[in-house]
């Protein structure tokens, strides 16, 4: 969803420039595009999030996708989550990727139990895992076990500069961060999750996918903002060859 003003049109133009189909994005007269403010100090930041209350609905004429990537949605989207849950249950061949945002964590496990139960790949950081599970334990394996019990088949947990972990319920993996000197960290988690998801969609193993994510995270934190610095597949593959 987008507002029918310059910021919204800029978003649409940027998506089109990068080859993203925008026909399912709703343009709403008289509404503003979501606008978030970032408080930036040293290499870290705090984001002040404000979601507009757009009308939402799952497209009826959509061709069955190979993957759905579900991330941050604002308050007032409970019915939309229900539609997504219903679609995923009715289309088990669709791989659901879930990277919950603030409101989705606030909704709690029970309201989203069918989302968790049918999730193919799940992404969060250590603090988010603790919040979702309502635990103080920061042991990665314990967090994996508790999250797998909710349903996700593959789980990825990031732990800042310590690196990232993955589990399929049988084996666990660890990947250190790609060596870099960060300038501003906004977008690192999104870059990691989306890049790993694409790698899985392309048929890469969990271990292979886990090598892709940190490279795009490394690149995006060299710049201000969440998009500048994102690598094309050719650029990413070159970094892999050079690693």
Whereabouts are the PLM-identified features?
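Glycine-rich phosphate-binding loop of ATP-grasp-fold ATP-dependent ligases
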Residues: 34
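Ribokinase/PfkB-type carbohydrate-kinase core domain
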Residues: 3-4, 9-27, 31, 39-121, ...
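Conserved post-catalytic alpha-helical subdomain immediately downstream of the catalytic base
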Residues: 150-152, 176-242
